[in-house]
Amino acid sequence: MPTNEQRRATAKRKLKRQLERRAKQARWRRVLLISGGVVVAVAVIITVVATVVISKLGHKHDTASSTASNSLTATKTPAVTPSVLPLPSFQPSTNLGVNCQYPPSADKAAKPVKPPRAGKVPTDPATVSASMATNQGNIGLLLNNAESPCTVNSFASLTGQGFFNNTKCHRLTTSLMLGVLQCGDPKVDGTGGPGYKFANEYPTDQYPPNDPKLKQPVLYPRGTLAMANSGPNTNGSQFFLVYHDSQLPPEYTVFGTIQADGLATLDKIAKGGIASGGDDGPPATEVTIESLRLD
């Protein structure tokens, strides 16, 4: 039969084991709490990094044309897929070409130029042909006056005033989702324009204002001629030529098509790639618009 001293010794050992067990549990709790904090911290960091990366991706083109004159932002899908909707069919509105306005923009004109005639503009003839002579070859254009008359009116005015002559095309994109050559900026940095702006037309005008579909990609097919912009209704002089099917939200006014000779010239330019590598930047093959005229 154990003595009192033995019982006390046993009780001490039992208490010691309990205290050690509690201390061990406490240490595990601290480890778990710290680990949880680290996990949360890592999750927050990952979220922030992801947000920054997505933000940079989303604003990449705006940054490239920083003072935010004219930019295109392709949708962040890996490639053109059959599920992407085509451009909507054109349905003329009752006010098409009735009141074209060209108010001053925030930036001064990159070259001396007068704004086009405002007010009502004709939608006839339905198409107007133009020739863009470049140092890389001719690019024939067919302007769609029946669908985007305010845009064609501006383009024709700038062409007649020689605004585009002896200017360089400052941007080429070669990604799977965006293949365009961008021109129309005498400053050659993505910020130049004519000193005025005007509203979007087709295909933007085929949707109700603030329609969520305006933010969803549609297919801008090879051979499309469209306006670059820095946001809704900020069109100026910069335009882009689509040399392979591209995904963009329908917020870039389509005002014509590119003829076969032009597509051959664009293919040659695109084959040269980007001057600094990558898939977006000044073309390695320098492109100068020597003259642009209506036929």
UniProtKB/Swiss-Prot annotation:
Single GO MF descriptor: peptidyl-prolyl cis-trans isomerase activity
Highest rank taxon of the organism: Bacteria
Domain PPIase cyclophilin-type: 126-294
Keywords on record: Isomerase, Rotamase
Residues that span the membrane, as ranges: none
Record's catalysed reaction(s): [protein]-peptidylproline (omega=180) = [protein]-peptidylproline (omega=0)
The keyword Isomerase appears for this protein: yes
Key word Isomerase present: yes
EC number: 5.2.1.8
One Pfam family recorded for the sequence: Pro_isomerase
Cross-referenced Gene3D superfamilies: Cyclophilin-like
Disordered: region residues: 105-128, 274-295
Role: PPIases accelerate the folding of proteins. It catalyzes the cis-trans isomerization of proline imidic peptide bonds in oligopeptides.
Similarity field: Belongs to the cyclophilin-type PPIase family.
PANTHER family attached to this UniProt entry: PEPTIDYL-PROLYL CIS-TRANS ISOMERASE B-RELATED (PTHR45625:SF3), PEPTIDYL-PROLYL CIS-TRANS ISOMERASE-RELATED (PTHR45625)
Name recorded for this polypeptide: Probable peptidyl-prolyl cis-trans isomerase B
Source organism of this protein record: Mycobacterium leprae (strain TN)
